[in-house]
C-alpha cells in the first residue's frame, strides 16, 4: 500500500467504530471454576451477554483471537487514513483486568513474542515500512507520551516536567493542541519502542485484588507526522504539507471498590478514575443520543475528554475497543462496557484532510490575480491617454508587418473555408450522409453564411467567400490602434511574465539545490542503512529461525515453570513417571509385609534417583550459567558496576521442579492410606490416576503464566540488543562531535599559542615598564619633590605603575583563560578514548548476547525434543488413566449399590447397636494397625536419611584424608629434600677441607711472593666452610625438630587431624544409630508378620454386612481426605499464582531499573553532545573574534605606520628648513675680530645647547612614542590624529631672530646644567627617559623660566604642541 496524492481538502463523515474483544478466563478464574457468560458471533458481529442481552458492533473478537487479527481488521485502515492526512484515534475501554493495556500494546515489549505484540508496535512498524517504500515523500515523525493521573497531566518522556507546564489549547481550525509536551523526533521503530518502554516504566501502576498490575492513570501515546509532497513542484512550485496525528489511548479501568478492595491512596485513585470515566460516559451519551442533539457537550469537565475532543465528534477517525471479561462474576461491569460501546456507535465524526500548503497557495494566487487585474486596468487607462497624445504614424510602423501577416493568414483560411464549403455542399447534394452527419453539415454551413453576412455588413463591401479585397483606410487605422493597444498590453504582460518566470527559475534552482542536498543526504542514509543491514543480517536470520521454531505446534505448552525473566528454559517433565504408578498389590498371605518393604524401598529409591537426576541436570544448568557469567565478567570487567543489572538479570538459578501439577505433596495422603489394605491400594491407584486425569485442567491453569517462559529469554535478549544498538549509535554520534570539537580546539590551540606568546611578550614589556617606573618614582622620592614639576612627575609615575600592574593582572588572566581553552583538545581526546572504550564494551556485550541467543535457541531445540518424548509418555499415561478410570467407575457403582441396599434394607437384616459398636472397635483397631505401618515406613525413611548422612560424612572424611595425605606427602618430600641438602653440604665441606689442607701445604713450601695470595684463598675457603657448617647445623635442627612445613600448613594439618577425629566420632555415632534402627525394624517386621496373620484371620471372620459397613466407613474417610486434599491443592495453586505474579513484578521492576539506568546514560550522552555543540559554537565565536581582533590590530598598525611615516617626512622637511635658516643666519658677514669672536662663541654656545637639548629630548621622545604606540595597540579601533595637528605646526610665522635664539640657548644652558644638592651629574639622562606628559607650549613669553624644554617640544613633537 502506498499513500496516494491528496488533492483538495475533503470532509468525510463517519461514525465511531466499535470493536468488542473478549479475553480468556484467567488462571484464578479457572481455578475457582468461574463460568463464561459471554456468547459471541463474529460473522453476525453480535455479542450476547447472558441469554437475552444482544449487542451489535462493528468488530467482534472471541477469546481465542490473536493480536494480528485485531490489528489487521481494525487498525490497519486507520493507518492508511493517517497517511492520507486524517487524524486517527484508537482507545481501549473496559473494566480493570480486561486486557486493555495488552491490546493497545503498552505492556512490556520484551515480555511478549512478535505475534503477541499489541497495536502500538505494529502500527509504528507499518508507518515506517510505508515511509521506507515512498522515498519521494519528505516526512518527519514525532511522538509524545503522557498520562492523566488524578486529573493532572504528566509527561512520561520528561518526568521532571511539572503539570502546570502542560496546557490544552485550540488552534484557528478548532483542533486540540497540547502545549508543553515533549515531542521526540524519531527515525525508526527501535527508537519508538525505546521511548515507549521508558514511558511505561514511569507510568503509575498498582496492585488491586482484581489485577496485580492495574493501570492507575489514563495514557495517551501520540504519533505526529508531517509529509511534504512535491508532486506539483514542476508546475507551479507548490508544496503540499500533510499533518496528521494518531492517538493511542489506554483508559484506566472502571473499578468497583468492593471488588478491588482499595483503601487509602488506591481509593483516591479509584475515585478520580471513576469520575473521569463518568464524564467520558456523559460526553458519549450526549453525542450518541439523537434526542440530545444541540445540547451542551461537557468536554471541559475532565482532562481526558478535552484531549479526546477531536476523537469524539470532531476531526478524526475513531476506533473504540471495548474489552470485556467473560467471567460471570464480572457480569455487571461487562454490561456497562457494552452499553458504552453501543452509545459510542451513534457518534458521527467529520474527518478532514489536514493540508496546509495548498489552501495557502490558492489564497495567495487569488490575491495575486486581483492585484494583476487592478494593475492591468490602470495600465490600460494610462496607455489610452499616452496613445491619444502620441504620434500615430510612429506607433503604426512596427505593426504593419504583423498586420500583413495576419491578412495573409486570413486569406489562406478563407480559401480553405471556400473549398470546404463547396465540398460539403456537393456531399449534401449526393445524399450519402446519414441524418446526424447531415445535421452537423447544415449547422456548419449556416454558421459560415452568418459569418459571411456579418463581414459583409461590417465592411460595407461585397465580400463573398472568395473575395479578398482590402479594408478602407479608416477601418484600418481603427484596427491598427486597437492592435497597438493590444500589443502594449502584451508587452506589459510579457515583462510581468518574464519577472514571474525569473522568480520561478530562481525557485526551480533553489529546489534543484535542495534536491541535490537531499540526494546527497539520501546517499549517505542509504550507505548507513546498508552498513546497518549488514551488521544486523545475522540477527535477522536468527530471529527468523526463532520465529519458525515458535510457529511449530506444541511449542512449550508443557513448560509449567515459575521462573524469572531472562532465565534459561528448563523442561518441567524431567521427572520420571514412576511416582504416578502404584505399587503392585497382592491379596494373600505373607507377601503383604514384603510388598510394604519393597514398595517403600522402591518408592524412596525412585525418589532419590529422581532427585539426583534433577540435581545433576540443574547443576549442568548452573555450570553453564556460571560459565556464561565468567565469560560475561571477562568481557564486561570495565563496566561491571555500570551494568550490574545485566549480570543479575542473566543469572540462571536452580528451579525446583515439582513432582506433579501442584508439587511433591500431591499424592502423599492417598499413598499413606493405600498401605493398610489392598482396597486402600486401589484407592491409591485411583487417586494417582485422577490426579493424572486432572493434569490437563491444572496445566491450563498454569499455562497462562508459564507457557512461553522459554521464549522470554530470547525476547528480552533481542530487546537488549536493540537497546544496545541505539546506545551505540548515540555514543558514536557523541564521538563524532568530540572529534569535531578536538579538531576545532587544535585549530584554536595554534591561534592561542601565538596569542599566548604575544601576551607573554606584552606582559614582559609591561613588567619592564613597571620596573622603570618604580625606579623613577624612587628617584623622585629621593629628590624630595621640591617643585611642582617633580610632584606631577611622581604622580604620573604612580598612575603608570598602577596601570602597568592592572595590565599585568589582566594579561595573566588572559593567559590563564587562553591556557584553559588550549586544554580543550586534550580533554576531548581523553573523552573520545573513554567513549571508544565504552562503545567497544557495548559491542562486546552485544556479541555476548548474540552468542547467548544462539545457545538458548539450541537449548530450546533440545528441550523441544524432550517435550516430544514427554508427550508420548503423557499419552501412555492417559491411556492407562482411562483404564483405571473404568475400574474406578465399576467400584464406585458397587459401593453405591451397597449403600442403596443398606438404606432400603434389602438384605433382610438391620445392623444392631452392638454390631455398630463392634464395627467401630474394628475400625479403631485397623487405624491403630495402620499407624503401626506408618511408623514402620517412617522408620525406614529415617534409616535412609541416616544412611545418606553417613555417606555425606564419609565423603567429607575422604576429602579431609585426601588433603591430609597431600600435606603429609609434602612433608615427606621436604624431609627428603633436606636429607639431600645435608648430604650435598657434607660433601662440599669435605672438599673444602681437602682444599684447605692443600693450600696449607703450598703455603709452607711456597715462595714469599705467592704466600700472600694463598693466605687470601685460605681465608676465603675458611669463611665458606664456616657458612656451610652453619647451614648444616640449621638443616640438622630443622630435620631433628620436624619443622618441614610452613606455620600455616602446620596449622592446617592440625585442624585436619581434629576434623578427621570428629568425623570418626560422628561416623561411629551414626553407625550405632543405624544399628539400633535396624534392630527396631527387624523387631517391627516380626510384629508386622504376626499382624498380617491376625489381620487376615479377623478379616476372614467378618461377615458380609460388617465388611460392607467397614468399607463404607473407610470410603467416607477417603472422600473427606480427598476434599481436604482438594482444598489444599487450590490453596497451593493460589499461592503459586501469587508467587508467579510476584516474580513477574520483580522482573518488571528489574527491567524498569535497567531502563532508568539506560535512560540516564542516554540523557547524559545527549547532554554531552549538546555540550560539545556549545563548545564548538564558542570556539567558532572565539575564532571569529580573534580574526576580527587581528584584522583590527592590523588596521591599527597600518594607521600608526602611516601616521609615523607622515611625521617622519614632516620632520625631514622641518629639519631642512631649519638648516637653511641656520645657514642664512650664520652666513658670511663683515665683522670685526671681536664680533667674529663673539659670534663664534655664540655659535658654539648655540650649537652646544642644541646638541645637549637634542640629547636630552631624544629619550623622552622615544619613550613617548613607545607609550603612544602601546596605547594605540590597546585601543580596539584606529584612533585618528588629533584635530589640532597641522603640517604648518613649525614656528614659521614666529621666526626667531639670532638674538632671541642666542638668549634662549644661554638661558637653557645653565638651567640644564644646574646640579642640585644630593643629585649626581646624570640626573637628566636618567630622568628624561621618563615618558611624562609635558604641558602644552604657550605662545612666546617674556620670562625665560616658564618653559625649560620649549625648543625641543616645539620642534620635534608637533602633535602634542601644535601652533
Swiss-Prot record:
GO cellular component terms, alphabetically, are: cilium; cytoplasm; Hedgehog signaling complex; kinesin complex; microtubule
* Region of interest (Disordered), ranges: 603-642, 1314-1346
Principal subcellular localisation of the protein: cytoplasm
Q: Name one Pfam family in it.
A: Kinesin
The residues forming a coiled coil are 358-385, 491-552, 714-1068, 1116-1225
Which residue intervals are annotated with compositional bias (Polar residues) in the record?
603-622, 1318-1331
The Kinesin motor domain sits at 15-347
UniProt cross-references to InterPro entries, sorted A to Z: Kinesin-like_fam, Kinesin_motor_CS, Kinesin_motor_dom, Kinesin_motor_dom_sf, P-loop_NTPase
Subcellular location field: Cytoplasm, Cytoskeleton; Cell projection, Cilium
Q: Name one GO biological process term.
A: photoreceptor cell outer segment organization
**Biased segments, Basic and acidic residues type:** 623-640
Record has ATP-binding as a keyword: yes
Q: What would be an example GO MF term here?
A: ATP hydrolysis activity
Q: Which residues bind ATP?
A: 94-101
This protein's UniProt keywords: ATP-binding, Cell projection, Cilium, Coiled coil, Cytoplasm, Cytoskeleton, Microtubule, Motor protein, Nucleotide-binding, Repressor
Q: How does it assemble?
A: Binds microtubules. Interacts with gli1 and sufu.
Give the family from UniProt: Belongs to the TRAFAC class myosin-kinesin ATPase superfamily. Kinesin family. KIF27 subfamily.
Function field: Acts downstream of smo as an intracellular repressor of hedgehog signaling pathway, mainly through the suppression of gli1 activity. This negative regulatory effect is enhanced in conjunction with the suppressor of fused (sufu) protein. Positively regulates gli2a activity by promoting its dissociation from sufu. Involved in the regulation of microtubular dynamics.
What is the recorded name of this protein?
Kinesin-like protein kif7
Give the organism, scientific name: Danio rerio (Zebrafish)
Amino acid at each position: 500500500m502506498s499513500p496516494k496524492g491528496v488533492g483538495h481538502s475533503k470532509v468525510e463523515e463517519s461514525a465511531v467504530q466499535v470493536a468488542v474483544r473478549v479475553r480468556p478466563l484467567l488462571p484464578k478464574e479457572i481455578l475457582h471454576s468461574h463460568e463464561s457468560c459471554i456468547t459471541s458471533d463474529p460473522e453476525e458481529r453480535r455479542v450476547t451477554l447472558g441469554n437475552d442481552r444482544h449487542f451489535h458492533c462493528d468488530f467482534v473478537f472471541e477469546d481465542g483471537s490473536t493480536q494480528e487479527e485485531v490489528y489487521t481488521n481494525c487498525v490497519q485502515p486507520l493507518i492508511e487514513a493517517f497517511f492520507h492526512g486524517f487524524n486517527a484515534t484508537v482507545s481501549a475501554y473496559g473494566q480493570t483486568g480486561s486486557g486493555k493495556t495488552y491490546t493497545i500494546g503498552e505492556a512490556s515489549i520484551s515480555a511478549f513474542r512478535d505475534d503477541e505484540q499489541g497495536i502500538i508496535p505494529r502500527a509504528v512498524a507499518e508507518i515506517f515500512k510505508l515511509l521506507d517504500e515512498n522515498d519521494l515523500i519528505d516526512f518527519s515523525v514525532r511522538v509524545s507520551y503522557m498520562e492523566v493521573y488524578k486529573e493532572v497531566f504528566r509527561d512520561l518522556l520528561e518526568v521532571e516536567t511539572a503539570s502546570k507546564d502542560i496546557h490544552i489549547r485550540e488552534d484557528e481550525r478548532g483542533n486540540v493542541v497540547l502545549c508543553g509536551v515533549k515531542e521526540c523526533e524519531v527515525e525508526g521503530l527501535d527508537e519508538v519502542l525505546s521511548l515507549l518502554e521508558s514511558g511505561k516504566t514511569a507510568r503509575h501502576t498498582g496492585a488491586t485484588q482484581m489485577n496485580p498490575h492495574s493501570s492507575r492513570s489514563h495514557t495517551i501515546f501520540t504519533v505526529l507526522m508531517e509529509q511534504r509532497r512535491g508532486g506539483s513542484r514542476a508546475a507551479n512550485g507548490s508544496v503540499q504539507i500533510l499533518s496528521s496525528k494518531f492517538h493511542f489511548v489506554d483508559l484506566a479501568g472502571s473499578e468497583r471498590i468492593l471488588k478491588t478492595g482499595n483503601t487509602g491512596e488506591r481509593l483516591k485513585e479509584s475515585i478520580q478514575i471513576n469520575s473521569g470515566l463518568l464524564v467520558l460516559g456523559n460526553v458519549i451519551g450526549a453525542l450518541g443520543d439523537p434526542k440530545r442533539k444541540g445540547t451542551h457537550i461537557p468536554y471541559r469537565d475532565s482532562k481526558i475528554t478535552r484531549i479526546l475532543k477531536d476523537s469524539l465528534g470532531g476531526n478524526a477517525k475513531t476506533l473504540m475497543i471495548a474489552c470485556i471479561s467473560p467471567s460471570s462474576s464480572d457480569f455487571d461491569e461487562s454490561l456497562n462496557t457494552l452499553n458504552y460501546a453501543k452509545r459510542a456507535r451513534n457518534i458521527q465524526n467529520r474527518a478532514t484532510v489536514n493540508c496546509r500548503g495548498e489552501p495557502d497557495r490558492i489564497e495567495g494566487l487569488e490575491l495575486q490575480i486581483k492585484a494583476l487585474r487592478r494593475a492591468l486596468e490602470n495600465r490600460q487607462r494610462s496607455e489610452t491617454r499616452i496613445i491619444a497624445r502620441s504620434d500615430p504614424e510612429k506607433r503604426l510602423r512596427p505593426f504593419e508587418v504583423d498586420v500583413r501577416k495576419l491578412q495573409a493568414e486570413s486569406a489562406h483560411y478563407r480559401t480553405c473555408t471556400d473549398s470546404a464549403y463547396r465540398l460539403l455542399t456537393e456531399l449534401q447534394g449526393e445524399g450519402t450522409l446519414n441524418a446526424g452527419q447531415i445535421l452537423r453539415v447544415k449547422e456548419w454551413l449556416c454558421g459560415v453564411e452568418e459569418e459571411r453576412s456579418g463581414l459583409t455588413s461590417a465592411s460595407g463591401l461585397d465580400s463573398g467567400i472568395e473575395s479578398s479585397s482590402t479594408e478602407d483606410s479608416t477601418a484600418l487605422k481603427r484596427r491598427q490602434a486597437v492592435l497597438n493597444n493590444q500589443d502594449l498590453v502584451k508587452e506589459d504582460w510579457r515583462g510581468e511574465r518574464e519577472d514571474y518566470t525569473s522568480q520561478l527559475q530562481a525557485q526551480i534552482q533553489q529546489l534543484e539545490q535542495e534536491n541535490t542536498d537531499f540526494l546527497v543526504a539520501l546517499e549517505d542514509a542509504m550507505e548507513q542503512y546498508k552498513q546497518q543491514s549488514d551488521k544486523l543480517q545475522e540477527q535477522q536470520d536468527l530471529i527468523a529461525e526463532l520465529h519458525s521454531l515458535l510457529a511449530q505446534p506444541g511449542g512449550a505448552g508443557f513448560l509449567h515453570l515459575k521462573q524469572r525473566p531472562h532465565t534459561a528454559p528448563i523442561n518441567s517433565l524431567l521427572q520420571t513417571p514412576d511416582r504416578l504408578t502404584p505399587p503392585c498389590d497382592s491379596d494373600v498371605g505373607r507377601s503383604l509385609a514384603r510388598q510394604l518393604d519393597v514398595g517403600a524401598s522402591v518408592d524412596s529409591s525412585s525418589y532419590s534417583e529422581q532427585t539426583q537426576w534433577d540435581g545433576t541436570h540443574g547443576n549442568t544448568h548452573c555450570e553453564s550459567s556460571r560459565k556464561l557469567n565468567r565469560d560475561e565478567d571477562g568481557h564486561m570487567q570495565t563496566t561491571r558496576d555500570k551494568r550490574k543489572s545485566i549480570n543479575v538479570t542473566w543469572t540462571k538459578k536452580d528451579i525446583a521442579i515439582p513432582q506433579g501439577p501442584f508439587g511433591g505433596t500431591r499424592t502423599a495422603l492417598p499413598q499413606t492410606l493405600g498401605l493398610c489394605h489392598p482396597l486402600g491400594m486401589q484407592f491409591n491407584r485411583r487417586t494417582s490416576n485422577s490426579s493424572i486425569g486432572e493434569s490437563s485442567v491444572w496445566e491450563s491453569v498454569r499455562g497462562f503464566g508459564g507457557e512461553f517462559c522459554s521464549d522470554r529469554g530470547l525476547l528480552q535478549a533481542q530487546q537488549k540488543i536493540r537497546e544496545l544498538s541505539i546506545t551505540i549509535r548515540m555514543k558514536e554520534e557523541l564521538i563524532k562531535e568530540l572529534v569535531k570539537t578536538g579538531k576545532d580546539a587544535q585549530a584554536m590551540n595554534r591561534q592561542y599559542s601565538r596569542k599566548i606568546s604575544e601576551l607573554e611578550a606584552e606582559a614582559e614589556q609591561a613588567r619592564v615598564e613597571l620596573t622603570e617606573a618604580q625606579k623613577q618614582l624612587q628617584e623622585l622620592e629621593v629628590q624630595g619633590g621640591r617643585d611642582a614639576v617633580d610632584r606631577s612627575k611622581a604622580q604620573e609615575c604612580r598612575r603608570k605603575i598602577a596601570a602597568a600592574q592592572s595590565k599585568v593582572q589582566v594579561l595573566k588572566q588572559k593567559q590563564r583563560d587562553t591556557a584553559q581553552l588550549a586544554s580543550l583538545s586534550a580533554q576531548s581526546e581523553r573523552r573520545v578514548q573513554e567513549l571508544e572504550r565504552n562503545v567497544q564494551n557495548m559491542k562486546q556485550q552485544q556479541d555476548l548476547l548474540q552468542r547467548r541467543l544462539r545457545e538458548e535457541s539450541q537449548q530450546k531445540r533440545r528441550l523441544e525434543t524432550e517435550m516430544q518424548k514427554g508427550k508420548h509418555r503423557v499419552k501412555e499415561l492417559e491411556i492407562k488413566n482411562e483404564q483405571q478410570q473404568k475400574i474406578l467407575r465399576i467400584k464406585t457403582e458397587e459401593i453405591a449399590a451397597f449403600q442403596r441396599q443398606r438404606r432400603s434394607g434389602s438384605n433382610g437384616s438391620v445392623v444392631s447397636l452392638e454390631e455398630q459398636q463392634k464395627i467401630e472397635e474394628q475400625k479403631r483397631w485397623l487405624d491403630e494397625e495402620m499407624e503401626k505401618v506408618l511408623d514402620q515406613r517412617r522408620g525406614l525413611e529415617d534409616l535412609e536419611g541416616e544412611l545418606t548422612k553417613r555417606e555425606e560424612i564419609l565423603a567429607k572424611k575422604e576429602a579431609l584424608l585426601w588433603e591430609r595425605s597431600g600435606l603429609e606427602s609434602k612433608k615427606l618430600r621436604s624431609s627428603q629434600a633436606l636429607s639431600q641438602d645435608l648430604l650435598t653440604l657434607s660433601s662440599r665441606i669435605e672438599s673444602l677441607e681437602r682444599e684447605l689442607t692443600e693450600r696449607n701445604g703450598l703455603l709452607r713450601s711456597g715462595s714469599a711472593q705467592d704466600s700472600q695470595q694463598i693466605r687470601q684463598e685460605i681465608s676465603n675457603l675458611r669463611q665458606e666452610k664456616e657458612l656451610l657448617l652453619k647451614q648444616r647445623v640449621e638443616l640438622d635442627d630443622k630435620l631433628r625438630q620436624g619443622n618441614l612445613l610452613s606455620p600455616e600448613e602446620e596449622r592446617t594439618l592440625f585442624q585436619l587431624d581434629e576434623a578427621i577425629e570428629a568425623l570418626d566420632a560422628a561416623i561411629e555415632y551414626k553407625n550405632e544409630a543405624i544399628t539400633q534402627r535396624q534392630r527396631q525394624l527387624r523387631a517391627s517386621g516380626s510384629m508386622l508378620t504376626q499382624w498380617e496373620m491376625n489381620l487376615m484371620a479377623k478379616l476372614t471372620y467378618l461377615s458380609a454386612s460388617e465388611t460392607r459397613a467397614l468399607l463404607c466407613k473407610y470410603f467416607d474417610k477417603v472422600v473427606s481426605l480427598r476434599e481436604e486434599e482438594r482444598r489444599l491443592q487450590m490453596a497451593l495453586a493460589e499461592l503459586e499464582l501469587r508467587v508467579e505474579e510476584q516474580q513477574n513484578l520483580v522482573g518488571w521492576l528489574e527491567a524498569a531499573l535497567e531502563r532508568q539506568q539506560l535512560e540516564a546514560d542516554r540523557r547524559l550522552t545527549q547532554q554531552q553532545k549538546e555540550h560539545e555543540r556549545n563548545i564548538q559554537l564558542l570556539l567558532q565565536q572565539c575564532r571569529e573574534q580573534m580574526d576580527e581582533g587581528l584584522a583590527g590590530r592590523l588596521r591599527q598598525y597600518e594607521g600608526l605606520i602611516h601616521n609615523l611615516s607622515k611625521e617622519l617626512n614632516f620632520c625631514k622637511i622641518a629639519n631642512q628648513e631649519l638648516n637653511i635658516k641656520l645657514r642664512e643666519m650664520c652666513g658670511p658677514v663683515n665683522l670685526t675680530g671681536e664680533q667674529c669672536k663673539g659670534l663664534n662663541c655664540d655659535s658654539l654656545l648655540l650649537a652646544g645647547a642644541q646638541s645637549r637639548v637634542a640629547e636630552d629630548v631624544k629619550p623622552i621622545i622615544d619613550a613617548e612614542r613607545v607609550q603612544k604606540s602601546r596605547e594605540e595597540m590597546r585601543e580596539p579601533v584606529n584612533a585618528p590624529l588629533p584635530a589640532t595637528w597641522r603640517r604648518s605646526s613649525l614656528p614659521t610665522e614666529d621666526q626667531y631672530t639670532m638674538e632671541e635664539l642666542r638668549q634662549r640657548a644661554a638661558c637653557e644652558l645653565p638651567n640644564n646644567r644646574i646640579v642640585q644638592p644630593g643629585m649626581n651629574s646624570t640626573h637628566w639622562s636618567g630622568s628624561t627617559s621618563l615618558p611624562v606628559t609635558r604641558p602644552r607650549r604657550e605662545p612666546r613669553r617674556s620670562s625665560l623660566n616658564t618653559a625649560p624644554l620649549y625648543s625641543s617640544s616645539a620642534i620635534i613633537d608637533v602633535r602634542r604642541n601644535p601652533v
